[in-house]
């Protein structure tokens, strides 16, 4: 039992299974935990323990998600699996489970199906950077040519959505056989090969602290004789005393200098990702900065008003709208710490959007917000959340 000892200093990578219903996502998830436990140590999780996914509430949205963990020799993986298609849509749009890479499970017996396509599209929209394919149920296909045909179809589908289809790793196997302990090529070795492929193909994610500094502003105070202090939680990067920073969003971008960082009334020489701090700004007046703006490393983020969004509209049961909305709908968009009104343009041919739907739409805000692709937001009406979305692509 010597291999039970976990190394907690390994890099953490977040992954998840995506793909059409009944193509074997949950079976593969269980097989991954079993194979990793047997080969490299750790704990296996049974199929039932994953399939009965607990419901969680993320921004008021009910999402059923299973979380499992497994280890390769060099990494610790946190893996999400969802029981239903609607759960995937909600999960990916809210960013409840941000993925560094996804495992697309496709049945070799059926080939790509509607949700295969939809999950690839969602991955593109919400910014999942890498996809690895597991061609499942390979034991049910005797004809090698048929396997190759399905592989080609999957590669074409990935390329359709700007993933590198020709270079995407595809592993053929049987998740069920692997889960049963089968040691033939398509059983446990195929799943082991999948994990080794994740190790090689998905790069180690950059830690928040190594990214360019960004802090959403929550509050603004003026301290007599010292100047203006803004408070908030540092989202990423580090701000050091003496560094030049920009104030971005709502108004024209301005430059200032950080002349002090405080945490719990103690003076620090820097504020780091994850910390709640007060930042003292040189020469900035109390009325020149407000909640909803961000402090950022100069040049690292710009303000925008127009973008394409992928949106999930809450159902009535989730406390959302009871009625559909139409083209020209003008709700508030809640970014980080503030609401901004925006107008929605629906895709051509879409008359209306019903509660419980997901939709791609064009949005134009009445004031610019510091944004980049992948930024999450809530849609609100009078302070009540009626939707969740992600910036798929900035247009202006």
Swiss-Prot record:
Its EC number is 3.6.5.3. GTP hydrolase that promotes the GTP-dependent binding of aminoacyl-tRNA to the A-site of ribosomes during protein biosynthesis. Its main location: cytoplasm. The keyword Transcription regulation does not apply. Residues 81-84 are annotated as: G3. This is Elongation factor Tu. It is found in: Cytoplasm. GO terms for cellular component: cytosol. It comes from Alcanivorax borkumensis (strain ATCC 700651 / DSM 11573 / NCIMB 13689 / SK2). GTP binds at residues 19-26, 81-85, 136-139.
């Amino acid at each position: 039992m010597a291999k039970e000892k976990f190394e907690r200093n390994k890099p953490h990578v977040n992954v998840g299974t995506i793909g059409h219903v009944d193509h074997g996502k949950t079976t593969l998830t269980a097989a991954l935990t079993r194979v990793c436990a047997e080969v490299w140590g750790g704990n296996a999780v049974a199929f039932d323990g994953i399939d009965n996914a607990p419901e969680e509430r993320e921004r008021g949205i009910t999402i059923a998600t299973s979380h499992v963990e497994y280890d390769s020799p060099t990494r610790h993986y946190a893996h999400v699996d969802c029981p239903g298609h609607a759960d995937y849509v909600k999960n990916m749009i809210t960013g409840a489970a941000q993925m560094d890479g996804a495992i697309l499970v496709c049945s070799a017996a059926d080939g790509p199906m509607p949700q295969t396509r939809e999950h690839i599209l969602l991955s593109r929209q919400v910014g999942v950077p890498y996809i690895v394919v597991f061609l499942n149920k390979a034991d049910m296909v005797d004809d090698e040519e048929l396997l190759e045909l399905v592989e080609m179809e999957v590669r074409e589908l990935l390329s359709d959505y700007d993933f590198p289809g020709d270079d995407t790793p595809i592993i053929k196997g049987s998740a069920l056989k692997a889960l049963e302990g089968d040691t033939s090529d398509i059983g446990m070795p195929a799943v082991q090969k999948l994990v080794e492929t994740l190790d090689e193909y998905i790069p180690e994610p950059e830690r928040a602290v190594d990214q360019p500094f960004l802090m959403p502003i929550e509050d603004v105070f003026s301290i007599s004789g010292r100047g203006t202090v803004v408070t908030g939680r540092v989202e990423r990067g580090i701000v050091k005393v003496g560094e030049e920073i920009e104030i971005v969003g709502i108004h024209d971008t301005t430059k200032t200098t950080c002349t002090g960082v405080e945490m719990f009334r103690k003076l620090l020489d820097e504020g780091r990702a994850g910390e709640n701090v007060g930042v003292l700004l040189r020469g900035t007046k109390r009325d020149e900065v407000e909640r909803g703006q961000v402090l950022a490393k100069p040049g690292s983020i710009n303000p925008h008003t127009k973008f394409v969004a992928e949106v999930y509209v809450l159902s009535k049961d989730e406390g959302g709208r009871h009625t559909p909305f139409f083209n020209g709908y003008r709700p508030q968009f809640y970014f980080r710490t503030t609401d901004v009104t925006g107008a929605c343009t629906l895709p051509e041919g879409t008359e209306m959007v019903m509660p419980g739907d997901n939709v791609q739409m064009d949005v134009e805000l009445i004031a610019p917000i510091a944004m980049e692709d992948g930024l999450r937001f809530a849609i609100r009406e009078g302070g009540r959340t009626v939707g969740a979305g992600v910036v798929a692509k900035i247009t202006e």
